[in-house]
Amino acid sequence: MIAQYADAMNHGYYASLGVEERDKAFGEDVAPEWRIIQKPAYYALHDFDGNGTDELLIGTLMDGIPTFYDIRSIAGGEAVRLFDASFGYRTNFDVYADGTIKVTWSSSAFESGFDYYKVSGAEAVLLSSQKTMADIENADALQYFKDGAEISEEEYFALDSSYDALGPQPLNWVCVTE
């Protein structure tokens, strides 16, 4: 997988190819959002669940701040995606110092949220899910939910702040072409 990103960088992100040839050249493991931005790709390894197996993260760095595109673990000797989502546009994730993964998503201007996960083996286990929804007739009227139950705006942001207070997981980023 790392080799696919490196090959794309080494070949000018396949910019000289037609659309179909370009899609084939990238390969199925290269994040669609990364293909568009054409910035250097980096990877980091970190054992999130303490089982002795490092998870692989792929991203870019903007002023030293990562934008993540993929996270994988190992199952049966194969690299497996922990999430089905394509990251980098409406869905993104951050990694906290305690190993919690926060997935930030938006399905529309009227619905968005945060899902918090822990890695367990080759799976991402949902800890908590929060979302906010706007009334289609009154965009200023927001409703807040945690795990399906309505909560106050204060509770919604307090939970998110409690995770943010943990700070980011320090990661050692390496350019895929190194």
Where are the language model's segments positioned?
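Blade-edge motifs of beta-propeller repeat domains
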Residues: M1-I37, E78-Y89
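Acidic, small-residue rich beta-repeat scaffolds with periodic aromatic anchors
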Residues: M1-M9, D98-E178
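Beta-propeller blade termini
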Residues: K39-F48, R90-T100
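Repetitive beta-architecture junctions, highlighting loop-to-beta-strand starts
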Residues: A41, T67-Y69, S112
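A short, structured loop/turn motif at beta-sheet edges
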Residues: D47-N51, S73-E78, D94-V95, V119-A124
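Acidic/hydrophobic-patterned starts of short beta strands in beta-sheet-rich repeat architectures
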Residues: D49-T60, A97-T104
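Short glycine/acidic-enriched loop and turn motifs that connect beta-strands
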Residues: L61-I65, S107-F110
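Extracellular C-terminal loop/segment signatures of secreted glycoproteins
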Residues: I65-D94
